[in-house]
């Protein structure tokens, strides 16, 4: 029983020929150094999970500039030294004949100074006494400015100059990721109310340049300009784009129209983009199960006809179903955390290890990171 249908058929994504359609989802794991450089622990983690040739791994949500983040132990890629620290990780993945994209993840705003470089203080607010999501959205986030009711971001007007500086950060980081670190590409993050999504959702209100607020066209201007600048620098085939059209409490009345407009513009302007990566509607804090089979991201596939990655609450059986019915790739987060040989297990119907949620965000430790076991069947196959 080794045939799992479309899920195990090769597919061309950007410049890559993948051997199956199971993708390692980008996550926040806090295993980098205090100043955002890649550690040997991270190299080991990605080496483990790339051992099935032809696997696409999307690496940790990564800061692209001082303006976009800055708290410790989260990867960064905006200096030459930071980019060089990625080289062993990328080489380990390539040695296994797999592929690596780096996700670019700007926070919703500029962190206040007291939180920027105080991991313990930020962790107490963000992750304590609340459910956790390794995709980067702690349950305590309930507004664009506050986490657990504490305002952690500076209140400031987002000027056109600020926006252009953010765009340049994306371009610089993409250049470093592809030309120094030698990653296969980058993924732009427009998810869950973080910076690009905040613009799309109108989350700055009147506190941003008039050209970037109000109408759907204006609200989508910033992410489209980011895509234009980044693809011009490194090529469309090296860029993926992640969205969360059903972002729970942030869902606007016109969210369908916004996402249809955005997807239509991306398809028109960037037809060679590597992929679109969309998060399914789900109940975030009750096990991440898919909300329904009727309401999902398939409406976006009417407008984007290229490679499409879906993520959110999948198990092996629902992944097989999605690939067969929708022709999609399927991203796994928590199951990839707990199963370094996830692709092998799914193909051969081997039960999965269960993840340990308490270890998702333990800084700089192998616990819950590189210590999950491979299946005996996988080890015997080597």
From Swiss-Prot:
InterPro entries xref list: Aldolase_TIM, OxRdtase_FMN_N, Oye-like
Reaction it catalyzes: A + NADPH + H(+) = AH2 + NADP(+)
Enzyme class: oxidoreductase
Entry annotated with the keyword Ubl conjugation: no
Pfam families in alphabetical order: Oxidored_FMN (PF00724)
Family, similarity comment: Belongs to the NADH:flavin oxidoreductase/NADH oxidase family.
Protein name in UniProt: Putative NADPH dehydrogenase C5H10.04
Species whose genome carries this gene: Schizosaccharomyces pombe (strain 972 / ATCC 24843)
